[in-house]
Amino acid sequence: MTTEDDDQMLGPSGTQEKIYVSVRMRPLNDKEKFRNDVPDWECINNTTIIYRSHLSISERSMYPSAYTFDRVFSPECCTRQVYEQGAKEVAFSVVSGVNASVFAYGQTSSGKTYTMSGITDCALVDIYGYIDKHKEREFILKFSAMEIYNESVRDLLSTDTSPLRLLDDPEKGTVVEKLTEETLRDWNHFKELLSVCKAQRQIGETALNEVSSRSHQILRLTVESIAREFSTNDKFSTLTATVNFIDLAGSERASQSLSAGTRLKEGCHINRSLLTLGTVIRKLSKEKTGHIPFRDSKLTRILQSSLGGNARTAIICTMSPARIHVEQSRNTLLFASCAKEVTTNAQVNVVMSDKALVKHLQRELAKLESELRSPSQASIVSDTTALLTEKDLEVEKLKKEVFQLAQQLEQARSEIKDLRRMVEEEKNQEKETLSTETEGLNVLMEHQYPKLRVRRTWDSENTTPLSPISAHRSSISPRSTEYSYEENVFQLSDFRIDSASSSPQQLAFVTPFLKVPLDDIHVTDTVDQSHVHKEEAIEEPHVQEERFYEMAEHTDGNSEDNCREVRCIETEKSDISIGPVENMPESSPDKYEAVTAEEPVSVTEPKNLQHPTEEAVCVTETKNLQHPTEAENEEEEEEERVKEVSGASPEPKQESNLTKNPALCDLECSPDEFDTSMSNLSRISTPPALITPSPEKPFSWIMERDSQLFRGMKLTRSRSCRPSLLSSPSSSWLEKDADTPPSWYDKEFIKTAERNLTMCDIKNQRLLQDEFSGRSMPTTWFERSLSDTQTVDAASHGVSNEMSPNESPFRPSDASVFELQTSGRASISQDRTEETAAQKDKQIIHRSMEEREQKFLASNSTKSFKDAAMDPIQDYLDTALNWPVEFKRLQREIIELWHVCKVSMAHRSYFFLLFRGDQKDCLYLEVELRRLKYIRESFAQNSNDGNNMTLISCTRALTRERYKLSKLMQRKLSKEERENLFLRWGIGLNTNHRRVQLARRLWSDYKDMGHVRESASLVGKLNGFVDMKLTSTEMFGVNYAFRPPRPKKSSLWKRSVLSLSFL
């Protein structure tokens, strides 16, 4: 343990180390030599001692023959050497602020007092030498001494021999009360105090030793060091440490020491305290978890911090080599073997004073100020090579990053190019698809509808022409409508104006081919009704074009659950009527030219109207095969005949009558014969009384709601037309949307028109649908006998909407009938000559139209029978619809209505999880949407009536469902799952009623789709239909509302579930 420099003797701080154990064997004394005693122990090297005598077989199994320690001193070693190699490093650590202790343990007369006296003197000499070398710090040495005699603590520096008490201090540990502590002035003062301690200590004579120590002596030296003011060292704090020099009394046997009386009593206390010390060392060497009896002895209590606490410890065990003390020597070596396994944790004891702290802060402040004044002086010169190497590494790193970024840039550019190419390809495909659809639609419509032309009478020359109409061709498509195909009575496919065949004052319109008696279409109306159509006819061209674009932006929807108010056609002022033009065969002699939408169309009214009646207008379109002069002559002749015919049917002013001329026959003809009949009609100058709806005002057949009478008009649907259900919740809605152009969609449509229909209940609609499914529709065209004196009753008659759900388009046997049954009375005051001429004209037109229609249907029989079994839902699915966008819109609207109508959360969750965007789910979404709208309207109607019981009951049922879900959380979710849910939903784990809070938050924010999705998943998990296979969409109509396994007995709950299930 020798060192070259005393400055290196500073012990470690805060590190664990074991007790340094060394053994010193003394030589044989005079008494042992006089008895011719021989030594049995021998030191073979500096760390090992062996038992030299031969052991018996039984002793070899009990005791080892060799012992190894940190250091072994032979009898030839002096005390200075023992100090230097066995105790100096531990004792000298006190000057660096670490506590230390040095023990001397052994049997009586083994040389403990002799060894400790020399180690104490040598340690003080070294400490004073260190103080003289380090003038930068101020050292203060304090000395105290005590002895433990017969388990009593006595102060060796005081003449008072009364025992002292031991106290426990939380910072210092066990302290001795009223112990004298002297401050050492110098070396001589220390020697004087040692002399006093030697004189005060209890000693006695025994058979083994003439001067035997009868007590345990503890000499304590406390060293405090403080940095001086002129010192520039950063060690500004105060270091405080204590070193203990412990000279234990030797263990002895009464048989050997021949003690009696007081010596025997003293020996008993010594052996008891040494036995406690051995027990503490043995337990500390094995484990520190059990109880360690430090308080069983005053010695172990005082030395508690030295044995296993905050101190460095060195034990010097002394022994005698004589054979007579072999058992005592073996016990000493066993104690030393256990002691070297004990671990201590020494730390530096730092005490910082306020004065030292202030000085340190002032010094730091001055240093920082100097650096701010001269920053250049504080620059640190670094190694140039290391700096360049670091910079090179940074450059290489940056180069790699630049290379990676360049690769990413190239990849991004290539991806952008690919995306642009894909977008261009998609646009080209869309254009090709659109052009293909448009061509196919044009071909379909051209083969489906005839060409008609509108002429006016010569009496309307002085009327003011209205604004022309410009229809954009690209806006007319099967999907260019704001409403569904079921909301339109007439499906107008195209608007084109023939500049060659029509003058600016002529009105071109093409309507679906209908088998209608011409005498049933001769309609007159009141002035008030005609005024509405006058306003409709003066729409600006750009307004019409915008409406056509709006039609293309909306998808077809099902509106079977609502009814729309429809009024009769009013044409006091001739309405603008434009429709699709059929491409006639090249071989047809009467082929007409296709009209274009860019040319203006004028609408005029008769000049010589004597009362508010409506002139019948024939809607046709012909090709100018003759000279323009001849065409004008023909037009004049036709207008004269129209004037004559219309003037012969006067009507009352306030009454709407339907005039039926018996001379006219049904308009039943083939498409080929229809052109011929139109040509013949122009030649004989007989104007047909045909009424056509306006293309931009398809819903202009609306009569005023306050009207009591109207003329009925019965129209029979041709097999080339498809039925459509026209519905609306209120008449005000219809009036607002009456200007919306009709859409094209290849669906059946029912030819219906209703009088004064303002609101239809869904239950009545359901009954109406039952009638549709159970009633067979007429299979033959309506025929009516034409009588000159027949009058029609104009009283109010209901409108019958009848169509079989399975009715297929283009089937003659299943064709539905669009009827406007009318009744009333109208007096016909016409001259017999005019009636005969009109009847002849109508009969010619009727026969021509019938023959033409038969040929047309025969040519299209293949397509009609092919489409007879077409599924209307499949047609709806096959349309070019942006379904994902439409699905999200329907889903959000349904979720919002769920919230408004207080729908059961189980139903919401089941519906939300079942329908996830499949295009075939459109029907179920439409049904659910209409159901919810009806519930909302029912709630509103009940609220207006002062009855809110339905909404209140639904709210109560929803509250009970939330309470039930909170109960299901306790049953079906584990504690860990519930805590995770609470944290995910922002509910504190330390709050009350957490499950109720979570249940109240479910389906509370209907605008957040993430919240809706989480709510549906949780409700589904609690109700048990998330993990199981969901009911198929085909069965959802039956299982419309999910019912939990154990429904509550409450009748309110049952009523709410049933109302949600079957409404």
Swiss-Prot record:
Keywords for this protein: ATP-binding, Coiled coil, Microtubule, Motor protein, Nucleotide-binding
Coiled-coil residue windows: 351-436
Region (Disordered): 574-664
This protein's GO CC annotations: microtubule; plasmodesma
Residues bound to ATP: 106-113
GO MF annotation terms: ATP binding; microtubule binding; microtubule motor activity
PROSITE patterns: KINESIN_MOTOR_1 (PS00411), KINESIN_MOTOR_2 (PS50067)
InterPro entries the UniProt entry points to: Kinesin-like_fam, Kinesin_motor_CS, Kinesin_motor_dom, Kinesin_motor_dom_sf, NACK_C, P-loop_NTPase
A single GO BP: microtubule-based movement
Annotated Kinesin motor domain residues: 18-342
Keyword Magnesium in record: no
Family, as annotated: Belongs to the TRAFAC class myosin-kinesin ATPase superfamily. Kinesin family. KIN-7 subfamily.
Protein's recorded name: Kinesin-like protein KIN-7H
Name of the gene encoding the protein in the UniProt record: KIN7H
